[in-house]
């Protein structure tokens, strides 16, 4: 397909699944790179001004990818002990992110 899209899905127990062919085929990404093998990924969002930068909220905090979801790193923050259920990038200042949390 000439206009294949990258599609990602956060899963309960399988981390992040990524497709580079508009959903025809899928593979798990990020295992051992901040996402552990049975991660509960609750939310994915991309940075407004940097479309290859993606954030994931999981049961053990916040994760970041700078290459459209191919590789992931844990973000060191006070959120590391919380399940991140929701993420929003400020529409006026894309350097501000809001996170909704709870216990895993």
List PLM regions with ranges.
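Extracellular glycan-interacting surfaces
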Residues: 1-104
């Amino acid at each position: 397909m000439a206009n294949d899209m990258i599609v990602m899905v956060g899963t309960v127990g399988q981390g992040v699944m990524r497709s580079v062919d508009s959903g025809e085929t899928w593979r798990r990404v990020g295992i051992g790179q901040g996402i552990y093998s049975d991660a509960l990924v609750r939310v994915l969002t991309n940075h407004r001004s940097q479309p290859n930068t993606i954030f994931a909220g999981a049961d053990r905090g916040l994760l970041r990818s700078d290459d459209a979801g191919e590789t992931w790193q844990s973000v060191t923050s006070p959120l590391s002990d919380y399940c991140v259920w929701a993420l929003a990038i400020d529409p006026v200042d894309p350097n501000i992110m809001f996170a909704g949390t709870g216990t895993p």
